[in-house]
Amino acid sequence: MARKIPLNRIRNIGIAAHIDAGKTTTTERILFYTGVSHKVGEVHDGAATMDWMEQEKERGITITSAATTCFWKDYQVNIIDTPGHVDFTIEVERSMRVLDGAVAVFCSVGGVQPQSETVWRQANKYGVPRMVFVNKMDRIGANFYNVESQISDRLKARPVPVVIPVGAEDTFKGVIDLLQMKALIWNDETMGAKYDIEEIPADLVEKANEYREKMIEAAAEQDEALMEKYLNGEELTTEEIKRGLKIGCHAMAIIPMLCGSSFKNKGVQTLLDAVIDYLPAPTEVADIHGVDAKDETKEISVQSSDEGEFAGLAFKIMTDPFVGQLTFVRVYRGSLESGSYVYNSTKGKKERVGRLLKMHANKREDIKEIYAGEICAFVGLKETLTGDTLCSEKEPVILERMEFPEPVISIAVEPKTKADQEKMGIALNKLAEEDPSFRVNSDEETGQTIISGMGELHLEIIVDRMKREFKVEAEVGQPQVAFRETVRKAVNKECKYAKQSGGRGQYGHVFIKLEPQEAGKGYEFVNDISGGVIPKEYIPAVDKGIKEAMQSGVLAGYPVVDFKVTLYDGSYHDVDSSEMAFKIAGSMAFKDAAREASPVLLEPIMKVEVEVPEDYMGDVIGDLNRRRGQINSMGDRSGIKVINAFVPLAEMFGYSTDLRSATQGRGTYTMEFSHYGEVPGNISKEIIEKRKG
């Protein structure tokens, strides 16, 4: 079966936005106008087809990225819905990996909000070309031009409007298309399905001319031939302007900018046209890099084409009540039929693909074969996890691995009834497979099950999903912070482990130097043994001993981070030495050295941004100071005060409730992990005493 739509007519896009900028509504409208969903779903009443998990319906925020396919003017658009909440940035990063372009949705009133900055940085990191849709133009306080200047000031990007609004707030009627120089006015009877093309209103002609000139200049700058023509005073054709804007958009030099009101069904078609005109096809983005699975030092670049052996990346795992486990895969090269085998090069295992499903919001369609540039769900994979590469055994390649952040918050969970113990274990493991930023382990001392994640909301949703999807009700303990330990000075230490009591003895003797590393460097082991004073085969055992010992530090038993150990001397015994003996010697030497190396306790410090009306500013700052916060900056954002601070996570529990009562529900905040910082002496002492209990 040959492919129906050529590769250059495919667009893989993500729609990324801050909460409440209207992202899900925008996606919904796209599905409506491209003929997928017949009744327009509203987030307000929880019926949107994209938000298909129950909790999302209740909370009205999008949690998991579902991939949906729709068609517009002979083009296939695959939309990956990305969550807009800070606790889910992992989901956003993951979808950024497999996108070719993104539409950033901003609210015309709120503009660029903290989460939008985070998402923007992630899109920069993965080199995703993007365009902007300014939504909610019908709201009170809507201002398209404000958002334009915020994008250049805050995001340091260059927005180029290709349409400008006609009216704003309740007089918002449509847009002026700066390419055709016509006004597109939507009529409300057809639910926005049709618009009338009219002459530009007299009071907007001057503004339209000014913005058209800016747009043409931006387009001309992207290409030498166009620049020459422009400087010679010749008119650029519509096609030439589009070409210039497309080149600039792909190079991330400019950001095409549009506006509308998804809720009021205005401006969505022009957005779809722009997606096709400016965002790249899979063939127009840089080749993805990978390494040879047989020899990881050898780089391979994988070109988007149907030719060549199959290669794809698993970017999302979901459990579907009817089909079982779905593995969402982006195909980069080649094609694959359902029922065939794929090779998971990350794990080194072969798996059979039972079915291939194309997802349309919440409906699914079985397909026989999938081609390069496509995104679809594989059914039947048992071993594959997020970030694994699937390819053909003939040409095994490992595509770039995704990096996942370490969790910063943990809570103990136990099932309400003993009978649910096993069910809870199964449920948590399934959820951990879906979400790499969520971990499950059991506390050896207390035997409790501990779950860890990226924030309170993240863990709340996990507990909620256990109840809904797996029917397990859980009791939740107090949140615990992921403390760490580190050392502040360098120490040399000798340790001899010798046991001589009948039978074979044990003998391991090491000299190590323990020294601090800069924050975030992690653990480094240096082998500086010369002349064979310790045989080669025992050296990894010393490293292993240190790795085991660093899991539980000398102060309060927290993992030790950011240090370097150099093994520089030692001795061995022909008969009694063994790997075991050197492992024990390594771990004892490390523990002894750590006690003398000025150990300190570290805690996660969060970057917190609070938005409050001016009247409450003093109270909120006072409260942040009481929470050991360090205020970094204060500013204004469209009439609201914005406070940026670093605050220890340990002090932030229950903050949302406190902020609500302090500001009568008018304050909002976001927080994300920033770095680990040293715990002050008096507090550190309390924590250590409590741990040793």
Swiss-Prot record:
Cellular component annotations (GO), alphabetically ordered: cytoplasm
Biological process annotations from GO: ribosome disassembly
One Pfam family per UniProt: EFG_C
Residues in tr-type G domain copies: 8-283
Subcellular location: Cytoplasm
GO molecular function: GTP binding; GTPase activity; translation elongation factor activity
Residues that, per the record, bind GTP: 17-24, 81-85, 135-138
Key words, A-Z: Cytoplasm, Elongation factor, GTP-binding, Nucleotide-binding, Protein biosynthesis
Keyword Endoplasmic reticulum: no
Family that this chain belongs to: Belongs to the TRAFAC class translation factor GTPase superfamily. Classic translation factor GTPase family. EF-G/EF-2 subfamily.
Function, as annotated: Catalyzes the GTP-dependent ribosomal translocation step during translation elongation. During this step, the ribosome changes from the pre-translocational (PRE) to the post-translocational (POST) state as the newly formed A-site-bound peptidyl-tRNA and P-site-bound deacylated tRNA move to the P and E sites, respectively. Catalyzes the coordinated movement of the two tRNA molecules, the mRNA and conformational changes in the ribosome.
NCBIfam families per UniProt: EF-G, PRK12740.1-3, PRK12740.1-5, PRK13351.1-1, small_GTP
The protein's name in its UniProt record: Elongation factor G
Organism: Wolinella succinogenes (strain ATCC 29543 / DSM 1740 / CCUG 13145 / JCM 31913 / LMG 7466 / NCTC 11488 / FDC 602W) (Vibrio succinogenes)
Annotated gene: fusA
